[in-house]
Amino acid sequence: MRFIHALLLAGIAHSAYASEKLTFKTDLEKLEREKAAQIGVAIVDPQGEIVAGHRMAQRFAMCSTFKFPLAALVFERIDSGTERGDRKLSYGPDMIVEWSPATERFLASGHMTVLEAAQAAVQLSDNGATNLLLREIGGPAAMTQYFRKIGDSVSRLDRKEPEMNDNTPGDLRDTTTPIAMARTVAKVLYGGALTSTSTHTIERWLIGNQTGDATLRAGFPKDWVVGEKTGTCANGGRNDIGFFKAQERDYAVAVYTTAPKLSAVERDELVASVGQVITQLILSTDK
């Protein structure tokens, strides 16, 4: 009798979970219709197992979300002893491109340290600092090699900033899929890709990111621990990737959207709305 009772409870729980995932999908499809948008979402656990998703295998332009795995690559080099965080990277005015606030600020001194550039790339989305790091690691191809090294066979970087933000429909360059990037986030933060010290530092940077207050973070409950890296592209691209801790459970998340008919503010609101849909799913399945 107890066995039958247990089976019934398991069946009810499975049915409820399936219902919540259907609601998740339905809510995202509704947002897509209302906003004339395409929305890609992947949520995975620390082992990279899928929790939920939508358009998970569809390619989207990475935009500046790649700056998080770029920073991870920099930390890997530091961890292995092939790089020093305090090494000064010299540069001149030619390194100043659109949206380079920290690079401009340090220009008078003629250099930034490796860690200063990495932090600026993550927390400010500084394009000059990003290109400076790309110069040091060996260019976009080296970034793609790092993706492959940590098990991501999909994500690719082909150009530097700002050219990589073209987001031309059908162009495979500088793209990823939500599931590939979510698993990359999980690998970096939970999979032992970095030392504990480097992992802690990059988590702290993501939590202190200064470009994401209006995106996923705005759609999540205030008591969740959230760290993320945003991205913005031409043709309506607005993205956010990172991690969150909800009810003592850790998750990696990747959200990629294309909404060319929306304003910049409306695209932020769209990503925040996706955050609300994710919240509803997580709270309902963690009961």
Swiss-Prot record:
A beta-lactam binds at residues 67, 125, 161. The active site is at residue 64. Disulfide bonds join 63-233. It catalyses: a beta-lactam + H2O = a substituted beta-amino acid. Keywords: Antibiotic resistance, Disulfide bond, Hydrolase, Signal. Induction: Expression may be regulated by promoter elements associated with upstream probable integrase gene Intl. One of its GO terms (biological process) is response to antibiotic. Its EC number is 3.5.2.6. Gene3D superfamilies: DD-peptidase/beta-lactamase superfamily. Inhibited by the beta-lactamase-blocking agents clavulanic acid, sulbactam and tazobactam. It is an enzyme of class 3 (hydrolase). Residues 1-18 form the signal peptide. Pfam families: Beta-lactamase2. GO terms for molecular function: beta-lactamase activity. NCBIfam families: bla_class_A, blaGES. Belongs to the class-A beta-lactamase family. Extended-spectrum beta-lactamase (ESBL) which confers resistance to penicillins, as well as first, third and fourth-generation cephalosporins. Has modest carbapenem-hydrolyzing activity. Has cefotaxime-hydrolyzing activity. The class A beta-lactamase family has a specific amino-acid numbering system, sometimes called Ambler or ABL numbering and often misspelt as Amber. A multiple sequence alignment was used to derive a consensus sequence and then the consensus was numbered taking into account insertions and deletions. This allows use of identical numbers, e.g. for active site residues, despite differences in protein length. UniProt always uses natural numbering of residues, hence there appear to be differences in numbering between this entry and some papers. This is Beta-lactamase GES-2.
